[in-house]
């Protein structure tokens, strides 16, 4: 029976414990253990952010060119990808890091052929360097990788938030939680699920989103087993 294909979008912030750390290897190892468990049932693709190492807000403070800043962000995701690959290798998980920019000594090219081979081998795919182009978000990258791998779901791991609300629950204690919303609702009400380009790509390719709190213990495993609170975004 063909395994269901899923993409998990993990922000760089999820990989750090506090402001003084860059990569928290306890968190990396915990994520790896969860991925190892679900890889027995799913073809798993991971899209990593790099915000634990480099953030666009820093570039603005330094009055840095946007192209350069975004390229630095892409390089940051490669570092994160190698750290996660190492943790998965220790668990004997068949893993490949696929990069949108050339870095042949460290990672493989994110090409259609390499993706096809990885799926055939049932490898966990770690996608790094975003789309390879500036001005595109990690959200857009997740949507593109989901389309390329023919994944049916993107798991959107949020830091400290259980899903989608009508306003920020950290600010508004009376914020309304949504169990299910449509792509059109997310766009028209600006519900901050992911950027508009990424939402449109998901809608066009029938890729559902599952928005959940990745900071909870065993969050990825539990949300796939429907044990945790989450929001579904679909047509």
Curated annotation (Swiss-Prot):
Q: Which UniProt keywords apply?
A: ATP-binding, Cytoplasm, Kinase, Nucleotide-binding, Pyrimidine biosynthesis, Transferase
Primary location: cytoplasm
Residue positions binding ATP: 9-12, 51, 55, 159, 165, 168
- Gene3D superfamilies assigned to the protein according to its UniProt record, in alphabetical order: Acetylglutamate kinase-like (3.40.1160.10)
Q: What does the entry say about activity and pH?
A: Optimum pH is 6.8.
Assembly behavior: Homohexamer; trimer of dimers.
**Protein's recorded name:** Uridylate kinase
List the source organism: Ureaplasma parvum serovar 3 (strain ATCC 700970)
């Amino acid at each position: 029976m063909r395994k269901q294909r899923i993409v998990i979008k993990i922000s760089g912030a999820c990989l750090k414990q506090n402001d003084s750390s860059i990569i928290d290897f306890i968190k990396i190892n915990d994520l790896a253990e969860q991925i190892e468990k679900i890889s027995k049932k799913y073809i798993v693709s991971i899209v990593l952010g790099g915000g634990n190492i480099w953030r666009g807000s820093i570039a603005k403070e330094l009055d840095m060119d946007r192209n350069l800043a975004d390229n630095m962000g892409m390089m940051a995701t490669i570092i994160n990808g190698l750290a996660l690959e190492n943790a998965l290798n220790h668990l004997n998980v068949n893993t490949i890091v696929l990069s949108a920019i050339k870095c042949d000594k460290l990672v493989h090219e994110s090409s259609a052929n390499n993706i096809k081979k990885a799926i055939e081998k049932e490898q966990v795919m770690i996608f790094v360097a975003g789309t390879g182009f500036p001005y595109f978000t990690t959200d857009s990258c997740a949507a593109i990788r989901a389309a390329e791998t023919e994944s049916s779901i993107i798991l959107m791991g949020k830091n400290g938030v259980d899903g989608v609300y009508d306003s920020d629950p950290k600010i508004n204690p009376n914020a309304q939680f949504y169990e299910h919303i449509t792509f059109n609702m997310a766009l028209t009400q600006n519900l901050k699920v992911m950027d508009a380009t990424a939402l449109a790509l998901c809608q066009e390719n029938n890729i559902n989103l599952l928005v959940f709190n990745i900071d909870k213990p065993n969050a990825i495993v539990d949300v796939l087993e429907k044990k945790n609170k989450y929001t579904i975004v679909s047509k």
